[in-house]
Design a protein with these regions (language model features):
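Single, function-defining residue in the core of a domain
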Residues: 1-55, 60-63, 68, 72, ...
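Short Lys/Arg-enriched helix C-cap and helix-to-coil transition segments
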Residues: 87-101
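Conserved beta-strand elements of the Class I
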Residues: 110-112
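Extracytosolic and intramembrane catalytic regions of membrane-associated proteins
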Residues: 132
Length: 436
């Protein structure tokens, strides 16, 4: 157990060394970049980017080198990282995760969740697709949108798509991640409202995956269906078409719950524009009560006998894990604090933070907290564990001590606690206002 953190660290360094054997695959000018001796060669640069937190670049370089040597200048770091392709850190993230990940199953299925989150960074008017000018005296700001695929049983990020906020399309990002996934086990993917497009459902089904998606009750896929009041679990089959002939309109009038005419602007890749065919879609619509005054409506292609409505309620509750992980990713790992305003550099930092999150989670999840006669069950304090794991990666903590240090930092699990979500505008912490 105490050697496990060292194994994870060695795996990360192994991936970086393998990439350093062929730096030309990950840089902008293969014939020039990383061909001369520098203070920040390819391998050292990647390691530094993963180790960094949210302080200034100067302080981060000093911390990562543990003050054992004079670091390269900030200008040198910026010049070296400009040579990297954005795909370099993405490859590191995915390869490291694949080498370390041991899938855990739920009833024979990998249980995944997809969600998106906005990431604010320094206003950059030179990037119009991410830039928002301030209105009513508000300062301008810039946003990227992170779409992430998350394993709910292993608590690891598996894939991510980064989009400029004005061009963000969560459904397109989900379809991209589903299409390129190499998962061999059966999969159940859960998602919140906004992912219930016909195109997305059919892409997931054709992949052989199962889906469980929360839908809007007032509009969307279920709005035209004849559904009962209260709780229910009903099978639904509808037919999609591009035709708008009188015969089709008559069918729509006679069976409004069965037929859908797709306008030309609606993307459904399995019915090209001008097609005269009908495309069948089948799924379950399930509604259940979650409190005295609120209900949830889900659509799924899971079998009713294997997954009754109570199981679906439990599955959807598990989806909250990705919401918690986003909070930890932003405010514990440091994804809300970037060291650049160029989208290419920020993309590097996002995948570096995702790699660090998985590194910390892999180590923390193997720490066993002994049960004692206490009022509450205790779990590891992830915030403290991240600090310990980051220092371990930087070489400031020896491997045998990592597990003991994490074991000593625990917090109680208090079931049944809930607080209304408070939304507020969070200002970006500029480069000149970082703690020393």
């Amino acid at each position: 157990m105490k050697n496990y953190p060292k194994r994870i660290k060695n795996t990360l360094h192994s991936v970086i060394r393998d990439m350093a054997k062929h730096p030309e695959d990950f840089c902008r000018c293969p014939e020039k970049n990383f061909t001369r001796n520098r203070k920040l060669p390819f391998e050292k640069l990647l390691t530094l980017l993963v180790k960094m937190g949210g302080h200034s670049l100067r302080d981060e370089m000093l911390d990562c080198l543990a003050f054992k040597e004079t670091p390269a200048s900030v200008s040198a770091l910026v010049q070296q990282r400009s040579k990297l392709l954005p795909e370099a850190l993405e490859y590191l993230f995915q390869e490291f995760t694949n080498r370390c990940h041991s899938p855990k199953l739920y009833k024979g299925y990998r249980l995944l969740a997809v969600d998106g989150s906005d990431l604010q960074f320094t206003a950059n008017p030179n990037d119009p697709l991410s830039y928002f000018p301030g209105v009513n005296g508000q300062k301008p700001y810039s946003f990227l949108h992170l779409n992430a695929l998350y394993d709910l049983n292993s608590n690891l990020y598996l894939d991510a798509v980064i989009q400029r906020r004005r061009a963000a399309n969560e459904n397109a990002a989900l379809i991209s991640m589903v299409g390129r996934s190499e998962i061999h086990e059966p999969v159940i993917i859960t998602a919140d409202r906004g992912y219930e497009s016909y195109n997305t459902l059919e892409h997931i089904s054709r992949k052989g995956w199962k889906y469980l998606i929360r839908v809007r009750e007032s509009r969307g896929i279920t709005s035209a269906l004849s559904l009962p009041e209260g709780d229910f679990d009903v099978p639904v089959q509808i037919f999609l078409t591009r035709k708008q002939t009188n015969a089709v309109k008559a069918l729509m009038k006679k069976h409004p719950e069965k037929y859908r005419i797709l306008p030309g602007h609606v993307n459904f890749e399995f019915l090209p524009e001008g097609s005269s065919e009908f495309y069948p879609l089948s799924f379950r619509v399930v509604r259940f009560q979650i409190s005295d005054d609120s209900t949830e409506t889900l659509i799924t292609n899971l079998d009713k006998d294997s997954f009754p409505s109570d199981d679906l309620k439990h599955l959807y509750h598990l989806r909250w894990g990705i919401e918690t992980s986003f909070r930890q990713l932003k405010y514990t790992i440091g994804l809300s604090l970037f060291q650049s305003k160029k989208v290419e550099y920020i993309t590097q930092e996002i995948f570096a933070r995702l790699t660090m999150y998985n590194f910390c989670e892999l180590i923390t999840s193997h720490v066993v907290i002994q049960k004692k006669c206490r009022k509450y069950v205790y779990q590891t304090n992830f915030t403290a564990a991240v600090h310990i794991c980051r220092q371990f990666l930087r070489g400031s903590v020896a491997p045998p001590k990592v597990v003991d240090l994490i074991k000593a930092q625990v917090v109680p699990i208090r079931p049944g606690r809930s607080t209304p979500r408070r939304t507020k505008n969070i200002k970006f912490n500029g480069f000149f206002y970082r703690i020393a």
